[in-house]
């Protein structure tokens, strides 16, 4: 289960593996997102609560990871 503050490993587009700390979850489709119990949720104005991101918007979600080389912004598919 993925949480903010976890140490993670990921591979970039050049197949280089990095270790880092997950610092934030972001989305191009939603303003307010969070990582709760390993599930990315967004604030629904309609229901006035956090709900899981819909499959059609999963590609808009990315994660900020702090490494020794700086900050990296990665997709869910890049985690090892």
Give the ranges of each region predicted by the language model.
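Short coil/loop residues immediately preceding or within conserved phosphate-binding loops
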Residues: 5, 17, 60
């Amino acid at each position: 289960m993925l949480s903010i503050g976890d140490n993670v490993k990921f591979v970039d587009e050049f197949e280089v593996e990095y270790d880092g700390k997950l610092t934030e979850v972001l989305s191009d489709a939603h303003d307010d997102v969070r990582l709760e119990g390993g599930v990315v949720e967004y604030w629904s104005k309609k229901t006035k609560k956090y709900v899981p991101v819909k499959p059609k918007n999963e590609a808009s979600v990315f994660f900020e990871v702090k490494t020794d080389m700086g900050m990296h912004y990665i997709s869910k598919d890049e985690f090892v």
